[in-house]
Amino acid sequence: MSRRGFTVIELLVSLAIIGLLLALLLPAVQAVRETARRAQCQNNLKQIGLAILEYESEHGVLPNGSGLRYDLLPYLGLTSIHSQYDPLIPPTPNNPEVAWARVKPNLIPLYVCPSDHVSPGGQWEAATSYPSCFGSGLLVNGFDGAFGLWGYTYLGHTSNPVRMSDITDGTSNVAAVGEWLYGDFRPKRLRARWILPSMYGTTEVEAFRDACETLPADPPAYGYQSINRRGFPWCFGSLGMGQYNHMLPPNRPSCSGAGVVPTGIYTAGSQHPGGAHLLFVDGHVAFQSENIDRRVWQHLGSRNDGAAVSSP
């Protein structure tokens, strides 16, 4: 009895068919996985939104933007991490944040979008994908968002605690927390904050915004300097590090003028195709297109500008 095996040609044809099937199936599998990651990211924001509302119900004000994610820990079942901050440890010249030493390394999955494949750290400090919104734009008009830096004053405007009654544009129309791509300590266009070489005055908002939006694809090749720690550590909320604004729509660069950090453009973004999620003060989450009208996006960042816009 003769035995019939595969010929070389048959084997090659079989391998080609298998390769073709894999090429057809792989994008579908990847799309399904991204859909699941996107849903988890949205759920993370919903959980944060519920915690914000619980905090407001107990304290009568929204949390301080400078410590939002830390202050929400007890409302997320993470009291054990919250208690690791030790205010009795005095700062030192070499380590002014020593009281936070045990808090910063904690990697909190709820604070990281699973679609972001860059490591959020964890050895010395961990990052967050979810910055709080301090307003519609530059601070020339003060902190007009849901959050800010309590007691901080800039150009005569002081950031004070925000009550629900202060949100006159409606809690369903005002941004609370967005998404962004946290830094990976390397100069990447949408992960870093870029220092524009020119100084921009308070009357040059449009010029500043245009210069940031048209940043080259490879900024370091053109001599641009950057700060690459956006989102680190998760428990802090300084402007551009833990808080963002609505100067530019999602997936645009972030910039500051030379020597004028508080007037920076700190932009939302994500690795979801086409845009980013946005948590509103009332707790609902909606996906925002990166092609959203710039004016609509900016109005969503303000709690009281009187514009008649609603969440897309």
Predicted regions mapped to residue ranges:
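Polar low-complexity intrinsically disordered regions
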Residues: 1-2, 300
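N-terminal single-pass transmembrane signal-anchor helix
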Residues: 2-37
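Internal low-complexity, small-residue/proline-rich segments
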Residues: 31-312
